[in-house]
Amino acid sequence: MNWLTNVVRPKIRNMLRRETPENLWIKCPDSGQLVFYKDVEANQFVIPGSNYHMRMGAVARLKSIFDNETWYDVALPDVTPDPLKFRDEKKYVDRIKDARARTNLNDAIKVGYGKLEGAAVVIAVQDFDFMGGSLGMAAGEAIVRGLELAVEKKSPFIVFAASGGARMQEGILSLMQMPRTTVAVQMLREAKQPYIVVLTNPTTGGVTASYAMLGDVQIAEPGALIGFAGARVIEQTIREKLPEGFQRAEYLKEHGMVDMVVHRHDLRPTLARLCRLLTKAPALETASKSVQPVVSPAQIVSASETAPAAPHA
């Protein structure tokens, strides 16, 4: 009997076992329903039933905005990977390596240059999956370089913010990115180019205290958590109970902190319309989203290099 239970049965189970992908199903944080991952991915990571907006990676975000899902990656400057030789439970350099392997990104922000309904734009996207989208030297350089390119190309700059705040492993060098990015935003304003911010879930800490709240137009995704300090910290400090929905996108819109709350499916036409209005450009023919990209990899362009618009069929 032991031979049957200990040897034969496990072998049969192994023969019949099928490998199941870990992310085959997604549980909605709002309703608790299980949804097929492919359905959520096809729906721009919005849960079909509850309309809950899941976090969206940088590459997926750029694909959803640029014409024909095609753009040029903006080459970003290298920075010292671990200036403070920081270590907690794990070395900082090892954390960066793990984050790069997991996300296939160099750091928390990816910058692209391309066309949005025929008009040239520069877009920066923070990816929360890369160390919580934290603002460090590399992320600060990415924002500054993107703004410089927007000035050079005389095009709008759009940033999708998603961050837990400044990167503690870089100390004061991380906090220094707050004034640096603020100065760069002012440089774009002096060039009379639009600066549009899309606040996604979550946008907190030093990012909220710098470039994420300086937009000519402030847009938020539904249900996004937006604030500087956490609600619990605020309650403990002021010794008062905060109102329901405090720091959520809808609450901030009601109190004038953001201009509009836009569903993810409506973001692309909304951003295109705002860019046309703010640049006083005529309405252009909308590029078809059903057309497949004619180049597979995004090409590289530096901020000082003149790049053509993303190629189309």
Curated annotation (Swiss-Prot):
State the pathway, as annotated in the record: Lipid metabolism; malonyl-CoA biosynthesis; malonyl-CoA from acetyl-CoA: step 1/1
The domain of life for this entry's organism is Bacteria
Q: What is its EC number?
A: 2.1.3.15
EC class: transferase
GO MF terms listed in the record are:
acetyl-CoA carboxylase activity; ATP binding; carboxyl- or carbamoyltransferase activity
Keywords on this record? ATP-binding, Cytoplasm, Fatty acid biosynthesis, Fatty acid metabolism, Lipid biosynthesis, Lipid metabolism, Nucleotide-binding, Transferase
Record keyword Coiled coil present? no
Q: Which InterPro entries does UniProt cross-reference here?
A: AcCoA_carboxyl_beta, Acetyl_CoA_COase_Trfase_b_su, ClpP/crotonase-like_dom_sf, COA_CT_N
Subcellular compartments: Cytoplasm
What's a Pfam family this protein contains?
Carboxyl_trans
GO terms for CC? acetate CoA-transferase complex
Its annotated function is as follows: Component of the acetyl coenzyme A carboxylase (ACC) complex. Biotin carboxylase (BC) catalyzes the carboxylation of biotin on its carrier protein (BCCP) and then the CO(2) group is transferred by the transcarboxylase to acetyl-CoA to form malonyl-CoA.
Q: What family name appears in the similarity comment?
A: Belongs to the AccD/PCCB family.
What is annotated about its quaternary structure and interactions? Acetyl-CoA carboxylase is a heterohexamer composed of biotin carboxyl carrier protein (AccB), biotin carboxylase (AccC) and two subunits each of ACCase subunit alpha (AccA) and ACCase subunit beta (AccD).
Q: What is this protein called?
A: Acetyl-coenzyme A carboxylase carboxyl transferase subunit beta
* Organism annotation: Bradyrhizobium diazoefficiens (strain JCM 10833 / BCRC 13528 / IAM 13628 / NBRC 14792 / USDA 110)
